[in-house]
Regions:
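Key DNA-contact positions within bacterial/archaeal DNA-binding proteins
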Residues: 38
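Amphipathic alpha-helical dimerization/coiled-coil segments
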Residues: 79-83
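Basic, amphipathic "hinge/linker" alpha-helix immediately C-terminal to the N-terminal HTH DNA-binding motif
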Residues: 59-77
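Short, hydrophobic-biased segments on the C-terminal half of alpha helices
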Residues: 44-45
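A short, conserved structural fragment
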Residues: 48-58
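N-terminal helix-turn-helix DNA-binding core of bacterial DNA-binding proteins
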Residues: 2-35
């Protein structure tokens, strides 16, 4: 399923937060992006059903291989554009 820009933003945030903190939860993504918790929960549901993330019972968000590949691609593109 193709990603929209907002989905890319969420995946990139998860990647960055995972590198900074290790464990990532929805509240971390909400704070990082400045979005409401309900908005993030909806986005996580879409990303999960699209196969980009999994969510553990304790609330941790993990990128799947497809999610990690997409997140790294977005991150590199943003780094290139900001240089």
């Amino acid at each position: 399923m193709p990603l929209h820009e907002s989905g890319e933003d969420y995946l990139e945030a998860i990647l960055v937060l995972h590198e900074q903190k290790g464990n990532v939860r929805s509240i971390d993504v909400a704070q990082h992006l400045g979005y409401s918790k309900p908005s993030v929960s909806r986005a996580m549901s879409i990303l999960r059903s699209s196969g980009y993330i999994t969510m553990e019972r304790d609330g941790r968000i993990l990128l799947t291989e497809a999610g990690k590949t997409a997140a790294e691609s977005v991150y590199e593109r943003h780094r290139f554009l900001t240089k």
